[in-house]
UniProtKB/Swiss-Prot annotation:
Protein name: Cytochrome b
Pfam families: Cytochrom_B_C (PF00032), Cytochrome_B (PF00033)
Function, as annotated: Component of the ubiquinol-cytochrome c reductase complex (complex III or cytochrome b-c1 complex) that is part of the mitochondrial respiratory chain. The b-c1 complex mediates electron transfer from ubiquinol to cytochrome c. Contributes to the generation of a proton gradient across the mitochondrial membrane that is then used for ATP synthesis.
Molecular function in Gene Ontology: metal ion binding; ubiquinol-cytochrome-c reductase activity
Record note on quaternary structure: The cytochrome bc1 complex contains 11 subunits: 3 respiratory subunits (MT-CYB, CYC1 and UQCRFS1), 2 core proteins (UQCRC1 and UQCRC2) and 6 low-molecular weight proteins (UQCRH/QCR6, UQCRB/QCR7, UQCRQ/QCR8, UQCR10/QCR9, UQCR11/QCR10 and a cleavage product of UQCRFS1). This cytochrome bc1 complex then forms a dimer.
Residues that, per the record, bind heme b b562: H83, H182
Native species: Rhizomys sinensis (Chinese bamboo rat)
Gene of this entry: MT-CYB
Cofactor note: Binds 2 heme b groups non-covalently.
PANTHER family: CYTOCHROME B
Binding-site list for heme b b566: H97, H196
Further comment found in the protein's record: Heme 1 (or BL or b562) is low-potential and absorbs at about 562 nm, and heme 2 (or BH or b566) is high-potential and absorbs at about 566 nm.
Positions that bind a ubiquinone: H201
Taxonomic superkingdom: Eukaryota
Membrane topology of the entry: Multi-pass membrane protein
Length: 379
C-alpha cells in the first residue's frame, strides 16, 4: 500500500510543497524568511479575526472600541499588541526576504519575483488601512494626507479622492470601507502567496552560489523544517518580548489621542516601515512628482531582472556589486531616519541626496558594476 501522503490528492500537494520538496543542500539562514512571512500572515489573520469581533467601524465608537478591547476583553490587550507589533515583524521579515532576493539574484525567477512585488504592494496597502482603524490623531491625519496624494493624478485625481473618501473628507464612510478592505486583503494576499509558492516550486529554490543545484538536493523535511522551527522560535521570542515589555515602542503617542479634524498634529508621519518611501515622497517639491517617486520606489524592483548585466547570478563572488548593495542598505536606513524627522533645513537636503542615491544605485551603478566585473573577469 502506498503512503497516504503520496497518494491522497490533497496530501500530495502538501507533500510536494513541504515534505518531499527537493531543496538545495547549501541554502543559508537567509532562506528562512519566506516561511517566517507565512507564519506572520497566519498570525495576523488569526489575531485580526479576534479583533474584528470586538471592533466597531464607526467614527464615534472606533477609538472607544479599541480601548474596550484593551480593557474589557479577555487578553484583548495581548491580541491587539501582537497584531500591531506582528505587522512590524512582518515588515522586518519582508525587507530581509527582498534583500536576500536582490543579493542572491533570485529576481531571475521572473514569475515568482513579479508576484512578490504584487505581494509587497498588497501588504503595504493592508498595513496602511489597518493603521487608520484605531481612529486616533495619526490614523485620521495619515489617512487624509496619503489619500489626498491621489488628487495629484491629472484630470481624475480630485474625483478619485472623493470617491475613495465616500464624501468630501475622511469620515464614517471612509472608515467603514477601510475596515472592509483591511479585512479582505489578507485573504487576497494568501491567494497571491499560493501563486508565489507555485511558481517557486516550478523552478526550485535558488542558493547562495547562484549556480544550478539539481545535482545536490535534499528533502525539505526534516532538514529545513527543523531549521525553520528555529527561526520561528527566535522570531516569536523577539515578538513576545516586544509585546510584553515595550508594546508602544514602534507606535506613535499621537494615536492615543482621539481623531480631531480641527487639530493637526505638529508632525504627520506613517509607521516606521513606510518612512523610507515617505522620505522619497517628501524629497520632491512637486506633488505629482512625489507620488510617482513613491510608487517607483517599490515598482523599480520589477526592472531588476532587466538591469542584471553580470553572467554571475549572485553577488557572492562580485565584491564591487556587494559594496553597492550595502551602500543601498545604508541609504535605505538613512531614508527611514529622514522620514521620521521634521521638514527642516539639514533633513530636506539629506533626504534629497539619499533619494537620488537610491535610484542611482539601482538604475545606474549596479548595472555598470556588473559590466565592469565582466571586463575584469576576462583579464
Amino acid at each position: 500500500m502506498t503512503n497516504l501522503r503520496k497518494s491522497h490528492p490533497l496530501m500530495k500537494i502538501i507533500n510536494h510543497a513541504f515534505i518531499d520538496l527537493p531543496t538545495p543542500s547549501n541554502i543559508s539562514v537567509w532562506w528562512n524568511f519566506g516561511s517566517l512571512l507565512g507564519i506572520c500572515l497566519i498570525m495576523q489573520i488569526i489575531t485580526g479575526l479576534f479583533l474584528a469581533m470586538h471592533y466597531s467601524s464607526d467614527t464615534y465608537t472606533a477609538f472607544s472600541s479599541v480601548a474596550h478591547i484593551c480593557r474589557d476583553v479577555n487578553y484583548g490587550w495581548l491580541i491587539r499588541y501582537i497584531h500591531a507589533n506582528g505587522a512590524s515583524m512582518f515588515f522586518i521579515c519582508l525587507f530581509l526576504h527582498i534583500g536576500r532576493g536582490m543579493y542572491y539574484g533570485s529576481y531571475t525567477f521572473l514569475e515568482t519575483w513579479n508576484i512578490g512585488i504584487l505581494l509587497v504592494f498588497s501588504i503595504m496597502a493592508t498595513a496602511f488601512l489597518g493603521y487608520v482603524l484605531p481612529w486616533g490623531q495619526m490614523s485620521f491625519w495619515g489617512a487624509t494626507v496619503i489619500t489626498n496624494l491621489l488628487s495629484a493624478i491629472p484630470y481624475i485625481g480630485p474625483t478619485l479622492v472623493e470617491w475613495i473618501w465616500g464624501g468630501f473628507s475622511v469620515d464614517k464612510a471612509t472608515l467603514s470601507r477601510f475596515f472592509a478592505f483591511h479585512f479582505i486583503l489578507p485573504f487576497i494576499i494568501t491567494a497571491l502567496v499560493m501563486g508565489h509558492l507555485l511558481f517557486l516550486h516550478e523552478t526550485g529554490s535558488n542558493n547562495p552560489t547562484g549556480l544550478n543545484s539539481n545535482a545536490d538536493k535534499i528533502p525539505f523535511h526534516p532538514y529545513y523544517t527543523i531549521k525553520d522551527i528555529l527561526g520561528f522560535i527566535i522570531m516569536m521570542l523577539i515578538l513576545i518580548s516586544l509585546t510584553l515589555f515595550s508594546p508602544d515602542l514602534l507606535g506613535d503617542p499621537d494615536n492615543y489621542t482621539p481623531a480631531n479634524p480641527l487639530n493637526t498634529p505638529p508632525h504627520i508621519k506613517p509607521e516606521w516601515y513606510f518612512l523610507f518611501a515617505y522620505a522619497i515622497l517628501r524629497s520632491i517639491p512637486n506633488k505629482l512628482g512625489g507620488v510617482i517617486a513613491l510608487v517607483l520606489s517599490i515598482l523599480i524592483l520589477i526592472l531588476l531582472p532587466l538591469l542584471h548585466t553580470s553572467p554571475m547570478r549572485s553577488l557572492t563572488f562580485r565584491p564591487l556589486s556587494q559594496c553597492l548593495f550595502w551602500i543601498l542598505v545604508a541609504d535605505l536606513i538613512t531614508l527611514t531616519w529622514i522620514g521620521g524627522q521634521p521638514v527642516e533645513t539639514p533633513f530636506i537636503l539629506i533626504g534629497q541626496v539619499a533619494s537620488i542615491l537610491y535610484f542611482s544605485i539601482l538604475l545606474i551603478f549596479l548595472p555598470l558594476a556588473g559590466m565592469l566585473e565582466n571586463k575584469t573577469m576576462k583579464f
